[in-house]
């Protein structure tokens, strides 16, 4: 798929009517906050986001514009990839953590959504394609995870701690990929806002670069 070729045949207004902007979500705002900010800044009727990120979680948050909002349902089950830091509450080696992961937390797993989640707390099956330890610093472990959409990483970390009988919790998390969208193609809010201001002043060059035709 040649996105640039697709863009050539569309006006900026057509892209805004049926396009997607891959936002690099900062920490603290909710996913809805980001979606609403994009809507108000662009002056479009409707926006929606592909896969919710907790307020403290950063990274890839594709925002659908107007008619593209109908596509969000098709992206919910897409694989997601994360990099994060977890703290294990006891002294353990990388090898011990990797052993526990390989025994219980790769492939098809059972997971119950956390208490704070908005979905029904019912056990469900999810697939973990990758859960790797990248680095260790004291009791803090940097990890990479590639999972089926709808997998709760915070719960994955907590369940790992329970399984090891050490306890564990997540310190930081960043989504680096959501389906076909990755962080290399994401746009921070400062650059987005600047591009919209330029568009409103008659220069749509930077904004066009940011919109992916749906």
Annotate each PLM feature.
Residues 1-58, 64-212:
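Non-catalytic RNA-recognition surface used by pseudouridine synthases
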